[in-house]
Amino acid sequence: MTYEMPKLPYANNALEPVISQQTIDYHYGKHLQTYVNNLNNLVPGTEYENKDLVTIVATAPDGAIFNNAGQVLNHTLYFLQFSPKPAHSEPTDKLAEAIKRDFGSFDNFKKEFTAAAVGLFGSGWAWLSVDKNGKLHITKEANGSNPVRAGLIPLLGFDVWEHSYYLDYQNRRADH
């Protein structure tokens, strides 16, 4: 199986001023492309050669294959979750109901999610995920890990590796 770059559903400058075109060019065009290339070079001849990204991330031991597969999966979810002109500024329908049920309010969720992202030491990801019973969870995952390793389904991912925000926000992770 050959892993490919996800196609962005928006122009590289469409997320400005929140995420600059320069950041998209480097983050998507350079960092993610490198992870895709690395994964395509690592998996031939291994038990993961014909596995999808979720399976690799859920089952591979720590190491180069896991790290690169994790970053391809994480970045694919990350870049595809954005919309330059969202229809709503807050979740609606079932997700809104679940957030209210599990966090009390959307504002409480934002506070908890932001605290997780800002409080993650070093590089990694903050995630909103759902378990098999429909309960929402906020997790912090180091480096290229993903909640699928714990049997969760990721719904929203926030990249707190410095390459995701440093060109626009420098050392101000919380502003990102």
Pin down the residues of each PLM region.
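Feature for soluble, non-membrane regions of globular proteins
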Residues: 1-176
